[in-house]
């Protein structure tokens, strides 16, 4: 079970892809940052600094991670009600899925 959200970025997205290579992996959460690859920095006139990712990052089937994020099996987003109640809805969903899988076995 892998939990991801918009804070999952760069090397963490690469780690998620590695874990997902196991067919038993379930990924839940919301879109990751889609921001992995090397950083190429440059300086424009007047000392203005800039940077960009110089690599495309893909799954073997061609899915582009850049700007789209990692693949998600179950999309779960926090709700206003859950936030008000101090609940971790993503963790609750993960535990529920684990319980379902355990009962199936």
Language-model features: locations:
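C-terminal "post-core" interaction segments
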Residues: 1-105
């Amino acid at each position: 079970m892998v939990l991801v959200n918009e804070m999952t970025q760069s090397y963490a997205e690469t780690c998620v892809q590695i874990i997902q290579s196991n067919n038993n992996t379930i990924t839940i959460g919301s879109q990751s940052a889609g921001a992995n690859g090397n950083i190429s920095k440059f300086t424009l006139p007047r000392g203005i600094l800039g940077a960009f990712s110089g690599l495309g990052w893909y799954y073997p089937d061609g899915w582009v991670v850049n700007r789209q994020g990692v693949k998600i099996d179950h999309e779960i987003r926090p709700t206003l009600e859950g936030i008000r109640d101090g609940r971790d809805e993503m963790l609750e969903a993960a535990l529920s899925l684990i319980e379902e899988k355990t009962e199936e076995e």
